[in-house]
Amino acid sequence: MSTAVMQDQAAKEKVEILAVIDGMKRARHDKNVHHVAAPYTADAAIFNLAPPLVHRGIDIAETQEWLDTWDGPIEITPQDFEVSVSGDIAFCHGYMRMDGTKKGADQPVSFWMRETLCLERRQGEWRIVHEHTSVPFYMDGSLRPAFDLKP
């Protein structure tokens, strides 16, 4: 296979993966729990902001409960995602900005997170097998989350 063909294939795969990420954004905005869960494998290792330390796959009831704590849409917008693909494995990392208003809250929520996704092509579709989301915290002894940081 020529270098040009391989580069075209890699570019196509990156577009497919970015479409998965965009679909996640739309699903959360629309609070559609089934679309939120769709790109994840049943055994995906998910290290997100909420306890416990690791989730395995998406728990539909738990995710719906979380979606229902928001008044209006939830905006989780990707930025500066870098995608690397090798065969049927891909990983990407970048930032996610989260904006929304929790029910009963006086102020909207708005902060940046770091995001890493590992995907595997299964039966022709890219599926998330690993997700790690984090917010840095200040190392000054306060353990405050660094919600003021921006990319």
Regions found by a protein language model. Name each.
Residues A11-V20, D30-D88, Y95, Q107:
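A solvent-exposed, acidic/Ser-Thr-rich amphipathic alpha-helical stretch
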Residues W112-S142:
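Short beta-strand edge/turn micro-motifs at domain boundaries
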Residues L149-P151:
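Extended, polar beta-sheet/loop recognition surfaces of beta-rich domains
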